[in-house]
């Protein structure tokens, strides 16, 4: 795809405040989008509904679970379980059909992010309290990764994401500027990156020097693995984006969006990465290592930010600071 354009499709209207989380699952031939918001609500949407009305695509409303804003969500592969986390310091495991929920406790402050592993058996949450909690699907706290743990982050845990095929491998991104990769089964730290560069603790130890592994100006804001898990893409508040090849521990591509990166999604049908920023939605093609399309959010209004992203084929769903969910169709240009 040498060049492309983003065409705005019909908005999904329902939320009244920032849409902080989006997740698409495919169940029984249906494609369901889950969205979470600062308005303390979660909606599920039938993306292929034929009903033509403002709220026609909404299947269910999940509310009453959080007393403060919802900061993120994830949904199991079979669509039966949803996990939400919020600024009230808790998480909840929801049965998506009955809407009943189980409380996740253990954090001392706002919970910012959540991820469910590849076989739907592990849940990890990250918090302002600088800890990550591992739960089972019954809601039991299995492991608390805090300041007493070697190699732990020294800032807020802004984002977490499980490897798409390795059930115990987790990546985490922090306000301390680092991305870390962990094996939760062995509780082992595997890798650390700062500014796209691998932090070699062993080499620093040999040279008797202190490794550089803290820089708040590089606060990590979003991340996503490639479909096969070989590449981890992450973005910073600085505007920088990095593609890191996990096996060789090298940064293979980078890009500067200038303004903070708020969200990242990996393309399903094309070799692209989508970035949501404080000004635009950007499509980065990994084959040519360049931007092939962008959408200026000022066309919607001043100060509009893209806080969450999810691909459905060639359609990119964008959760905005206004509360709207805007689908953008990625089309090849003539």
Swiss-Prot record:
Cross-referenced InterPro entries: G-protein_beta_WD-40_rep (IPR020472), WD40/YVTN_repeat-like_dom_sf (IPR015943), WD40_repeat_CS (IPR019775), WD40_repeat_dom_sf (IPR036322), WD40_rpt (IPR001680)
Regions that span the bilayer: none
Organism: Encephalitozoon cuniculi (strain GB-M1) (Microsporidian parasite)
Repeat found in the keyword field: yes
Top-rank taxon: Eukaryota
Protein name: Guanine nucleotide-binding protein subunit beta-like protein
Keywords annotated in UniProt: Repeat, WD repeat
Family: Belongs to the WD repeat G protein beta family.
Gene3D superfamilies named among the record's database cross-references: YVTN repeat-like/Quinoprotein amine dehydrogenase (2.130.10.10)
Repeat region (WD), residues: 14-55, 65-104, 106-145, 152-192, 215-256, 257-294
PANTHER family reported in the protein's UniProt record: F-BOX AND WD REPEAT DOMAIN CONTAINING 7, WD40 REPEAT PROTEIN
